[in-house]
């Protein structure tokens, strides 16, 4: 049995001028997803996807590189203005935001959507180094 030839999916260029950038910054990684107003993903990137491994994924520089890559992909679809939703306690929040602004996007609003418990689950123990 012969294998079927792998299909090459061409990405069609959408013409979307405004969208939402979701910056999810954890202690271990930073993920950036740019969506349209309905929430359909246009472009995404993360520090791990850009080749950073281990503890280097959680650095602000890795978040900046991931945000620049995601911005470049979104600009290919005609995106010009963004609302930014920042989530999580990580160190890449501000640097990802600065990288999106430096890429030429007009940032209309910045929202912090980090979930805060009303005394929910017990937190992790404090590290003793």
From Swiss-Prot:
InterPro entries: Ribosomal_uS11, Ribosomal_uS11_bac-type, Ribosomal_uS11_CS, Ribosomal_uS11_sf. Gene3D superfamilies: Ribosomal protein S11. The keyword RNA-binding applies. Pfam families: Ribosomal_S11. GO terms for biological process: translation. Disulfide bonds: none annotated. GO terms for cellular component: ribonucleoprotein complex; ribosome. Keywords: Ribonucleoprotein, Ribosomal protein, RNA-binding, rRNA-binding. GO terms for molecular function: rRNA binding; structural constituent of ribosome. PANTHER family: 40S RIBOSOMAL PROTEIN S14/30S RIBOSOMAL PROTEIN S11. Belongs to the universal ribosomal protein uS11 family. Located on the platform of the 30S subunit, it bridges several disparate RNA helices of the 16S rRNA. Forms part of the Shine-Dalgarno cleft in the 70S ribosome. Part of the 30S ribosomal subunit. Interacts with proteins S7 and S18. Binds to IF-3. This is Small ribosomal subunit protein uS11. The gene is rpsK.
């Amino acid at each position: 049995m012969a294998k079927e030839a792998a299909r090459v999916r061409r990405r069609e260029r959408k013409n979307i001028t405004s969208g939402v950038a979701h910056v999810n910054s954890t202690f271990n990684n930073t993920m950036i997803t740019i969506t349209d107003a309905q929430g359909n993903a246009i472009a995404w990137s993360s520090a791990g996807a850009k080749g950073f491994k281990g503890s280097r994924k959680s650095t602000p520089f890795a978040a900046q590189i991931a945000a620049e890559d995601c911005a470049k992909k979104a600009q290919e679809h005609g995106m010009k203005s963004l609302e930014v939703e920042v989530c999580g306690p990580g160190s890449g929040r501000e640097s990802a935001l600065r990288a999106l602004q430096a890429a030429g996007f007009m940032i209309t609003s910045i929202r912090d959507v980090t979930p805060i418990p009303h005394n929910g689950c017990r937190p992790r123990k404090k590290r003793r180094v």
